[in-house]
């Protein structure tokens, strides 16, 4: 149950009544009418912009609309007051019984409280990580993996049919570099000195690949030229790298539904089919692009190329898809891959890219808009850098990887749950500081601990209540005398719980799972605040001598626990029942 949706329904119903009474003209568009928490809680429990958005189309002063609407709303038994503020904003206060009833609603709904159907079963493809299969996942991949997986969980929670997908970049030159690097480790496995030339991958992670190559091929490749072993070693090493990446993802609690190969697009006609589709729309032509200002991109050349007219769909310049020598640009297989997604019947596409792919956003959106005739929206989320710190200094590289901190480095130091939560404590497009010391601190400043400690405190209340012989099942707690929850701090905590269904829908519509982490921190803060006040005010403690009062307060604590566990589930974090 979304209380904000319920009150918005009341507001629109009263606006309809005003229309019938002749106070408003017929045919007004009410889609922009919103009911939200006010910016300042002192102004009320909810606020609506109805009068402000209807003033111009109705030709009436906003304050006059607000005053008439306030009179009608104040007559509803759920509303204790409706006050006009400023030029026409309307602030509402709800009766305590509405808030108290929310506790029973949450306990009866259990883990379905907050779940939404706004996705309406639409098929959404979330492509994320898609790291080159050339080594173990690094910390930058970790953030993208967590954001993508949490987003997929969020969308499923809100009613979408979600497919998690990994695009294997196995068609470019980097996998040839991988093969050459692995071959040097193969030579090393035979007792020869590896020649890790500049440009090759130096990490120790390729040593097992070399040993595996030796086990499979013996010394049969040692005396052969590159042209005889490159293809076999490339495929062998790529598969071993993908197995390593799958294990890395599993360590992070991420499971993909689909792995798609870039290499599979070549030689199958899929690239040609996608470009033929664009050609049918007169979006492919032969031409010479003006030289770009500043840094020259890899796909620019001062000769005639095959170009995609991406400017027809919002891009800044048209983009090359085939070079003058007849080879494809990097963009061509990406177009084909996204066309494949469109033809698989997805209603929505989401790509999670590293921040260094920012220049790709407009061209990729243009391609999808053209290939889907505007039917399939593409949202691209850019993941900013993660800065690692330990002992007050930047965290050093991993010897195993050779050049960077790996996913395993992070997870082995702090655990999967801490890693996942911390990666969602900032919006995806903001740089994130990950301090190995601070994320393990048991302090208010550590958001992971703060939220988990709230859940642990709730479970301690439930344990003590059981020890006293109380029935603390959700069904029994839902029948508690909830009007005993009348302190402003208790009402404020319930009001925060009431925001959960609305928060879920906003986060899902904007594809922003970090909002869930932010909300959980706010909810934990309300719970801890009430708990700490109980240290000074005995009447606010969750366990009371009066069993009727105690049951009501335990019901509130349990309702908070329901929402915390639901939120942590979306983040892919296991709730802690007891702090150790």
UniProtKB/Swiss-Prot annotation:
Its EC number is 6.1.1.19. It is found in: Cytoplasm. It is an enzyme of class 6 (ligase). Keywords: Aminoacyl-tRNA synthetase, ATP-binding, Cytoplasm, Ligase, Nucleotide-binding, Protein biosynthesis. GO terms for molecular function: arginine-tRNA ligase activity; ATP binding. One of its GO terms (biological process) is arginyl-tRNA aminoacylation. Its main location: cytoplasm. Pfam families: Arg_tRNA_synt_N, DALR_1, tRNA-synt_1d. InterPro entries: aa-tRNA-synth_I_CS, Arg-tRNA-ligase, Arg-tRNA-synth_N, Arg-tRNA-synth_N_sf, ArgRS_core, DALR_anticod-bd, Rossmann-like_a/b/a_fold, tRNAsynth_Ia_anticodon-bd. GO terms for cellular component: cytoplasm. The keyword S-adenosyl-L-methionine does not apply. It catalyses: tRNA(Arg) + L-arginine + ATP = L-arginyl-tRNA(Arg) + AMP + diphosphate. A motif ('HIGH' region) lies at residues 131-141. Belongs to the class-I aminoacyl-tRNA synthetase family. NCBIfam families: argS. Monomer. This is Arginine--tRNA ligase.
